[in-house]
Amino acid sequence: MILGVDVGGTFTDLFAWDGERIQTAKLPTTPDQSKAVLDGASELADKVDFFVHGTTAATNALLERTGAHTLLVTSPGFEDVIEIGRQDRPSLYDPSDERPEPLVQRTDRVSDPSSVDPGNYESVAISLLGSYHDPSGEHLFRAAINEASPATAVSVSSEMVAEFREFERTSTTVLNAYLTPVVADYLARLEAGVRSVGLADAVSVMRSSGGLID
């Protein structure tokens, strides 16, 4: 039995196929999205061999600005790069241009991680100049943060997108750090629920770029 589940902000859609028969279900999405998934799955099957899941949990958290409280650690003088952006933006000289607020507030951007307590944050983004070529500085900072606050999630730019151009690398790393705790918490609840009722041994998740991750 194959079960496919797509969770949106309004409805949760399920598709089950046993090799001969197709079954579908549609339920309102619940505040804890895993509940609607489990309720719908119980209508279609007791046990599945392959559980495929797609969700807008990350998209919703970004649009609603409900992601993790995030700290940005970057090189001295580059704390504002995520706010300044690049000079090729369409309205470079428009003083009335309105842009979204950065995901990390100015007071939460530092060049020295020892100056703050990482335990006060759910997640940390580390993006240093030149780390696409030499990531050792980012690795040292991550080790220090992991030692000081093991429960805090850490994203490093050299692993997110190992390319030059500090704005793109930093903004991508910040986005990953901002959303990781939200998605990780949701998937942990979902997998625990799936296993507790014996529905499946694991959940495979659709990537926005295509393919699956386990």
Q: Can you describe what each PLM-predicted range is?
A:
Residues M1-D214:
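N-terminally biased helix-coil "hinge/interface" segments that flank
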